[in-house]
Amino acid sequence: MAGQVVQYGRHRKRRNYARISEVLELPNLIEIQTKSYEWFLREGLIEMFRDISPIEDFTGNLSLEFVDYRLGEPKYDLEESKNRDATYAAPLRVKVRLIIKETGEVKEQEVFMGDFPLMTDTGTFVINGAERVIVSQLVRSPSVYFNEKIDKNGRENYDATIIPNRGAWLEYETDAKDVVYVRIDRTRKLPLTVLLRALGFSSDQEIVDLLGDNEYLRNTLEKDGTENTEQALLEIYERLRPGEPPTVENAKSLLYSRFFDPKRYDLASVGRYKTNKKLHLKHRLFNQKLAEPIVNTETGEIVVEEGTVLDRRKIDEIMDVLESNANSEVFELHGSVIDEPVEIQSIKVYVPNDDEGRTTTVIGNAFPDSEVKCITPADIIASMSYFFNLLSGIGYTDDIDHLGNRRLRSVGELLQNQFRIGLSRMERVVRERMSIQDTESITPQQLINIRPVIASIKEFFGSSQLSQFMDQANPLAELTHKRRLSALGPGGLTRERAQMEVRDVHYSHYGRMCPIETPEGPNIGLINSLSSYARVNEFGFIETPYRKVDLDTHAITDQIDYLTADEEDSYVVAQANSKLDENGRFMDDEVVCRFRGNNTVMAKEKMDYMDVSPKQVVSAATACIPFLENDDSNRALMGANMQRQAVPLMNPEAPFVGTGMEHVAARDSGAAITAKHRGRVEHVESNEILVRRLVEENGVEHEGELDRYPLAKFKRSNSGTCYNQRPIVAVGDVVEYNEILADGPSMELGEMALGRNVVVGFMTWDGYNYEDAVIMSERLVKDDVYTSIHIEEYESEARDTKLGPEEITRDIPNVSESALKNLDDRGIVYIGAEVKDGDILVGKVTPKGVTELTAEERLLHAIFGEKAREVRDTSLRVPHGAGGIVLDVKVFNREEGDDTLSPGVNQLVRVYIVQKRKIHVGDKMCGRHGNKGVISKIVPEEDMPYLPDGRPIDIMLNPLGVPSRMNIGQVLELHLGMAAKNLGIHVASPVFDGANDDDVWSTIEEAGMARDGKTVLYDGRTGEPFDNRISVGVMYMLKLAHMVDDKLHARSTGPYSLVTQQPLGGKAQFGGQRFGEMEVWALEAYGAAYTLQEILTYKSDDTVGRVKTYEAIVKGENISRPSVPESFRVLMKELQSLGLDVKVMDEQDNEIEMTDVDDDDVVERKVDLQQNDAPETQKEVTD
């Protein structure tokens, strides 16, 4: 027997065909959300307050500091927040200190700074009652970037950019005459040496001594018209502020504020890290020949002789000396923007491949401290040096799509940036108030205006492109949404501008971003998913784990290192399926491996690392596809995406053929209920589970507190599906930490169960499965195999209007008693009532305009004391196709103190209607391999083809759907599924390490089936066997959210567009079917003139004609001739608005006045039937 039995959770065993043992547990799949938010609460907020403190007034007398903060208890708990449409948030209170320097007085106060949304345990936020997810954003990391480009003459050129987190960009470029220019903040370019002079290197000689003599520098100095620091400063000022009178002082302060002021310019810690890494001498001296010795500055000894070529080993040896500033120089700069001395490291090397033995200087930035978030003069000089080195052939250009140059902004950082915006707006207000208020009586509370802070947080959660309504169709959709990475959003790319290169799969995505799971359509490649083992480091770079290889013994160790994409570039990584002996050494002398994106074969001694698992390449959703290795990538993409659209079924069933990921995905998705502590189950009910904690002290276990786990029962999910949790533990069970206690929707026994295992045959049947259509047995309808429950929410508000308040009541004008049968005395539908389309759910009347009463009404009013009420019926009715059973009714009243109602609303009623939807013709189904189709026919069970033992099969699929799509995985799943069913087992075939052909065939033989997996089928209608044997097996098929009930739509009359008077389009607007240009051509080709005329007039925008037609049909009269369509008038007005004189003439060249053809005077054509009924003799008569 191939494979070994593995336990998944408490209740499920699977036969696992994996050959590679798991060395690392999968991490918690939603920690990308939870960890980032924890960081924000722990450090991010404090960092913000520290950055802004102290706020001083213009005289420097008052100083406001933010000392500390705390979060209070939320006003409503999670459930209550959802019910009340409130935000799940806690009050943020900040301790503020105000210092008055004149008197030395210190005032401290705790100031309320608004309610701050809290993250739930499952990584979501509840905003206005709806669960939302903040998607992580992929952006370009702040750093120094060097690019290669070809100019119009075909010459190779370079440009460089220093990109900060916020602040001015600095760019270097060369022109056709080999002059190097600099651009400050996208303005006009200046010779590079002007910026150097402004930094304090005044004379030409100083600049040449600094950067080393080369042709580019000489050309630039010739072009440079300035001669000293002052002239250079004035020159820069004129470029940045044209038209203003330049002075040296103004120029200094301008340059200072652009680059050296921490409030205006911020590299952030990640920018400092990347800049130091890029400009560090270690990477730049690699494989270079020294033109001078490297000297330890502290001891004065020579570490490396002149003429040495530095390989990687040599550089590692001298690393300490390089970091202790070997060959460093300190420059005292006078008259510059910054008066502090500048320290750099410079080492001369020989220009590669140069016969004349020329040298160039490699300058490093002397490694500024990580606390220095601004750019330093040393950074600018070192980046210029790198640029000149590139021109000499030393150094590397950067690939912007490499994940070493792209980083993630997760929830915490996105929130922090938003909070910073709010605080900086508040800072302005505080400064203004400081100058107005009286210093004696002033308090921190009076200075601080929290509105801008609250507004910026609300704006972020409510309307940011990255704050999204959670996709809650099933647990996998939930999980994937929380792990999504988007390159769109503020500060990111736009769909239109994103090039092919950005969207493409890059070698650095390996183990970090899934190469398969991405949407089809305009967002392809811009929205990605995090790989299964990946995690995000403190700088926001994605890391993936590798097993370390011992450099001496060349054996795999237990040490696991997480590497970022640029760290990985230095190492050779072996694949996870490399053969190892029992000591962890590679068995083959030549090992398949990766190095910088090249898949090659190298000697086993060269290996540095090895992959942790074959599934580290793909995301959680893709890892749920068995036999992924046998599917074409395009179909695998569809399979991964369609699993997220599977509707939770009433009776879910885990797949016979899984991958082992189902349990992990279900546990981490947030849809299941997991134990927060180890304990013993004391009580189980359908709506709650009680667990007594088991605590171990001094080796003795004793009982602790009681944990209560409430279960959600038949709630509506964000996608309108049924969210229901069911206990899977029994009283007395001892449960471990993080064990599943209750299944959520689409789960069975602690595993994800998106569909059902059904018996499928690959065969045609009277052409009903043409074009991927699916033929299904009626058994699946009768036995509720694919029945799903859907819950829709409808609400009705009673508002205050100008004419008086609206009223929710049972007393509705012109409505029969039978229409009110489901309403209670308040006018609200009963729970449990069965309602059909058009039934009243909430009776509501709205006051109409008050009219003058007639004499009779006045008399009645005098006798009975009541006026006939002038109200119109505005009741909430069941929309088309939404009938069902009323599940729940919620009523909110302003009188009862419901402060969550929006202004002007007195009463709000919410009605939940539940539908049980059986599977229909027209519903969409799919497998896990991108094999999708629409149900074309539901065949009675007795007519379905049946197996030799008399069992009818469930589904017939078209065999032509397999070869051209190249998703052979579905065929292997089919065979292995049948074997698993016959053996009564569940199997796991992990991606890239699953069952191979031999395993599948041997399992089939073990199950007593034919070796080719085919069988004789008999036609259910005739009882005759089919000519050929047919592949029959068990496939896991899902019902997708594209259901025909939601798409079916019909209209007779309905709303019309205001300008063109044509019917609206789409089901949501109750629109019509568009009869477009091509359809008109089709009718013209047939010569169907009258059909065409009525489609273009009565049925569309002939406003008068359609009313007359409706009238004629109701009265049984003949339909009158059409008048002018409204869109023709619109066209005329359009042309007239362009200044053209447009008139409509009849055959006698008399102008037809279009304005006359109005609703009041309709042109009617009357036929004198006595004369002749030919159309030519019809006369035009205007009534």
UniProtKB/Swiss-Prot annotation:
**Which reaction(s) are listed as its catalytic activity?**
RNA(n) + a ribonucleoside 5'-triphosphate = RNA(n+1) + diphosphate
Primary enzyme class:
transferase
Q: Which GO terms describe its biological process?
A: DNA-templated transcription
Which keywords annotate this record? DNA-directed RNA polymerase, Nucleotidyltransferase, Transcription, Transferase
* Any GO MF annotation of the entry: DNA-directed RNA polymerase activity
State the EC number(s).
2.7.7.6
Q: Which GO terms describe its cellular component?
A: DNA-directed RNA polymerase complex
Recorded hits in HAMAP family, A to Z, give: RNApol_bact_RpoB
Function as written in the Swiss-Prot or TrEMBL entry: DNA-dependent RNA polymerase catalyzes the transcription of DNA into RNA using the four ribonucleoside triphosphates as substrates.
Quaternary structure, per UniProt, is: The RNAP catalytic core consists of 2 alpha, 1 beta, 1 beta' and 1 omega subunit. When a sigma factor is associated with the core the holoenzyme is formed, which can initiate transcription.
Name the protein family.
Answer: Belongs to the RNA polymerase beta chain family.
- List the protein's name: DNA-directed RNA polymerase subunit beta
Q: What is the lineage of its organism?
A: Bacteria, Bacillati, Bacillota, Bacilli, Bacillales
Q: Which gene encodes it?
A: rpoB
